[in-house]
Amino acid sequence: SKFFFIASAWNGYIDCNIKSGDAGFVKIVEKGIIEYPEYDGNSMYRTAGNISKNPNVALLFLNFDGKSRRIRINGQATIHHDKKSIEDHFGAKFVVRINCEIYPNCPRYIPNLEKDEPSAYVPRKGKGIPPAPEWKERDYIKNILPKDDPHKNRN
């Protein structure tokens, strides 16, 4: 799957986000351990912030083709900023690694959307800086983007 949903929680609040990338962006490290890159996001770090306080996560992988099985994963996540972890994921700010239990699930009720168009926002080798998402152009956001944000001083 080129995307998955991840639920994380801290302080009584559950947060669900979508994570996406090119095919293979989620890597199997070894039996029972997967990892994925965290790219430039909205600087809220909700998933990463929750993981730093509570490592328990739930992931849902699915293809909207009407036939592929869903994959549910429950596990404990850790955040890795080391060079070795990051170099395996082009464009990553850091890597999230998950010790997991995997539960295959039937494709019943999954719609067939069959539109396979890659996101222009995923960093790709040789493609330069991805376009800025609309929200980074908002006046109240522009000035508070991180210093190293590639879209901070673009017009």
Stretch-by-stretch model annotation:
Residues S1-N155:
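Binding-site signature for planar aromatic cofactors or substrates
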